[in-house]
Regions:
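Active-site-adjacent pocket-lining segments in enzyme domains
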Residues: 1-118
Length: 118
């Protein structure tokens, strides 16, 4: 049942990307995209190069060691960078202005309440 659901999710992600609908994957979700071939020809990141290589995917030349990678409508991140991942999603979707997004990120990154007013 789990593998079937993963395949369905990957197929939906492929449809979204083909229709220019953003897709975001963090931690193990990047492995699901890799298994489906969705990371074979696009810049991406994951938990580590060795982690994602276990999927047998062909995208190693496109792997980047980075807190997040945004390639068109595809956003990927390792498990350790959930804050940066959220910031990239908000940026992609245009949820906040650049100024408000910077304040939001700084508040959660530092815990300094002065950024709340920004």
């Amino acid at each position: 049942m789990g593998q079937k659901k993963n395949l369905e999710a990957a197929q939906l992600a492929a449809e979204f990307l083909a229709n220019e609908v953003p897709v975001a994957a963090i931690c193990g979700a990047t492995a699901g995209l890799a298994r489906a071939g969705l990371l074979d020809k696009v810049l991406h990141t994951s938990n580590s190069k060795d982690y994602i290589a276990q999927t047998g995917y062909q995208g190693a030349p496109f792997y980047r060691v980075s807190p997040t990678v945004r390639a068109g409508g595809l956003i990927t991140a390792p498990a350790t960078n959930s804050l940066e991942f959220a910031r990239e999603i908000f940026s992609c979707l245009g949820v906040y202005s650049d100024e408000v997004l910077a304040g939001w990120y700084n508040l959660f990154n530092t815990g300094d309440a002065r950024y709340f007013a920004d």
